[in-house]
């Protein structure tokens, strides 16, 4: 039996975004953060994230919580990025989007 340990609802997405000014792909999002796939790894745990949520542009401060390589044959990495502090507009916009999902 599999138990869901996450406390926040999340939504699968496939959207291009920027992490520290470099291209990455957003694969899922929750109120706490995002799951991102990229070909590169940031130099620091603290990153700047630029993304669009429900046609609104946001620049957020994030902290990389974990990194995993998808496959030895591919040069893609998955990163879990936590958003410790988000603007109220981001929280409201994402909350509306998640409630409709």
Question: For each of these PLM feature ranges, what is it?
Answer:
Residues 73, 89-96:
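Short, charged, solvent-exposed linker or helix-capping segments at domain edges/interfaces
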Residues 25, 61-63:
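Residues located in well-ordered beta-strands
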Residues 34-38, 70-83:
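Short, solvent-exposed secondary-structure boundary/capping segments
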Residues 1-31, 95-101:
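N-terminal helix initiation/capping motif
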Residues 13, 58-60, 77:
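Hydrophobic core residues within well-ordered beta-strands of beta-rich domains
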Residues 40-44, 48, 92-93:
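Surface-exposed connector loops and short turns at secondary-structure junctions
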Residues 15-19, 44-58:
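Short conserved beta-strand and strand-loop elements enriched in small hydrophobics
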């Amino acid at each position: 039996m599999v138990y869901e340990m996450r406390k926040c609802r999340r939504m699968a997405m496939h959207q291009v975004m920027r992490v520290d000014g470099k291209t990455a792909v957003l694969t899922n999002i929750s109120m706490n953060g995002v799951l991102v796939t990229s070909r590169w790894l940031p130099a620091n745990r603290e990153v700047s994230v630029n993304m669009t949520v429900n046609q609104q542009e946001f620049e957020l401060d994030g902290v990389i919580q974990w990194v995993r390589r998808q496959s030895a044959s591919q040069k893609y990495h998955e990163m879990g990025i936590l958003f410790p502090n988000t603007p109220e507009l981001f929280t409201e916009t994402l909350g509306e989007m998640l409630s409709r999902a």
